[in-house]
Amino acid sequence: VNPFRASMILGTPGSGKSYAVVNNYIKQAIEKSYALYIYDFKFDDLSVIAYNHLIKYRHRYKIPPKFYVINFDNPRKSHRCNPLAPELMTDISDAYESSYTIMLNLNKSWVQKQGDFFVESPIVLFTAIIWFLKIYEGGKFCTFPHAIELLNKRYEDVFTILTSYPDLENYLSPFIDAWKGGASEQLQGQIASAKIPLSRLISPQLYWVMSGSDFTLDINNPKEPKVLCVGNNPDRISIYGAALGLYNSRIVKLINKKKQLKSCVIIDELPTIFFKGLDNLIATARSNKVAVVLGFQDFSQLKRDYGDKEAAVIMSTVGNVFSGQVVGETAKTLSERFGKILQKRESMSINRNDTSTSINTQLDSLIPASKISTLSQGMFVGAVADNFGETIEQKIFHAQIVVCLLYTSPSPRDS
């Protein structure tokens, strides 16, 4: 099975997708010396598995990776990392991407309204603030907390400072025109649409974690491999999700490069976070040895939070599919993906004089939607992708995934 063609794990709550598939992806990735990035929605469920397995198998790496955790709930047990580090941004488009990611994670309804005036305005304004911090005194204050604090100053003072830089004067021309033209109500509405969502992120914990630099986000750097776990909290999804989305977008750009270690990106409960660039990562990361694993409950969740177009791209470009029980349109879509099979049907008719038998053939679904919607816990259907020269004849499966709970000692050759 080729993991670099991306994997999708679906199933309703309790179907066993994390226990049977996601957990084993983590274990096998570590056993095969991958650099690892894990989005742990219910922290620390996946992080504990990764940490314990890394201790057991770290000898398999040429350079043992370091284990890092980002945990906003308990900063004392979290490492610090600045996702807006100035060295990561070479152009104002990098600042725009960061601003875009934050805003869409804070306002998921904006995903469907990209390009609208009151969507683009706050993104452009926050972009200018990030880029100012990047070019001011060599990026000394270029952190996410500094950007939020600067945004919340009086807009007259902020615009006076920003427009003193030629790089930003033209970029902010719509705001400056409104300011000088006396359209204060419109201007205040534009600024408020940036301030109000970002004010939810004003937190000592977030500020502390996102202003330090204990490590860099290039997890598959051959000289400094890493296993990075970022933890969310189901009770604070809307707050932590925006901050973690910024880490995600940075990591996607840094790991999808040539001459790096093979790596694995595991995103459990994908719809809880807006992962900018995910469709492009799936489509292009195979040649750079990046395995992407996405766990979510069904396609309707994905369409709701990512929009129809991006969800369709993600669903159609993933090569490996593992599905527990799903219902409705998701079950129908999977049934169509698995294809049809030619089956013989025999019918018999009986009347007073004789009995006749007829045999015909008909194309039926290989795995009907009705069967997918009634799968028991631990039972999965799916399709796998193979490699050139390593053909898998039976790509479609319907089986129980058996998880081995016994600890197997490393073989002597691994010591």
PLM features: residue spans?
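P-loop NTPase motor domains
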Residues: 3-290, 306, 371-392, 406, ...
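Conserved H-loop
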Residues: 297
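Long, positively charged, glycine-interspersed low-complexity recognition regions
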Residues: 292-294
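Surface-exposed, flexible loop/turn segments at secondary-structure boundaries
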Residues: 44, 75, 300-301, 329
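P-loop NTPase motor core of the ASCE superfamily
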Residues: 117-123, 280, 303-409, 413-415
